[in-house]
Amino acid sequence: MLASDRRERRVRLEEAFQRESVFKARTVELLRGRADKKNPEFVRAFMAAKQARRDVERHLRLAARVESVEQKARALQARVEAQAAVRGVLDRHRRFTRADFAEALDAAEDALAAGEDRLDDAAALDEDWAGGGAPDEDEGEEADEALLTQWLLEEAEEA
């Protein structure tokens, strides 16, 4: 919609409103002056005021209709722009929208979880071996005795 069209509509509405005000004021003035309702001047003023009132109502309806259409057009334009933005994001991330992507993502996540589980199992084996001593219990006791003996000797040397 051109700005000049909007301005022209506003001017016509304002002119109709001013005409109505002038003729209505003249009609009321004649009534207060006790003019006869058949007086040609009263009839002209009254008929002009009624016509101006219809013009104001018509211009208001037209302005409301145009504004409503413009609002709808702006809403649709915003929706189309939003769709274009969404399309741009989806185009940049096409791989995420493939039909098999969700399955591939789940499979990759499962594979990672399985790898982590295997790593945890391997780390647990290492902890068992490193922290729990040698697999043979007799060898463990001998190692403990040797360690205790070493500590006693070290303490005796210091004294």
Swiss-Prot record:
Q: What is this protein called?
A: Tegument protein UL14
Q: What is the lineage of its organism?
A: Viruses, Duplodnaviria, Heunggongvirae, Peploviricota, Herviviricetes
What's the superkingdom here?
Viruses
Q: Name one Pfam family in it.
A: Herpes_UL14
Q: Which GO terms describe its cellular component?
A: host cell cytoplasm; host cell nucleus; viral tegument
Naturally occurring in which organism (per UniProt):
Suid herpesvirus 1 (strain NIA-3) (SuHV-1)
Q: What does the UniProt entry say about where the protein is found?
A: Virion tegument; Host cytoplasm; Host nucleus
Question: Where is the stretch described as Disordered?
Answer: 123-145
Q: So what does this one do?
A: Contributes to the nuclear transport of the viral transcriptional activator VP16 during the early phase of infection. Therefore, participates indirectly in the regulation of the immediate-early gene expression. Additionally, seems to be important for efficient nuclear targeting of capsids.
Spell out the family assignment given in the record's similarity comment.
Belongs to the alphaherpesvirinae HHV-1 UL14 protein family.
InterPro entries in the cross-refs = Herpes_UL14
Primary localization: virion
Q: Which UniProt keywords apply?
A: Host cytoplasm, Host nucleus, Virion, Virion tegument
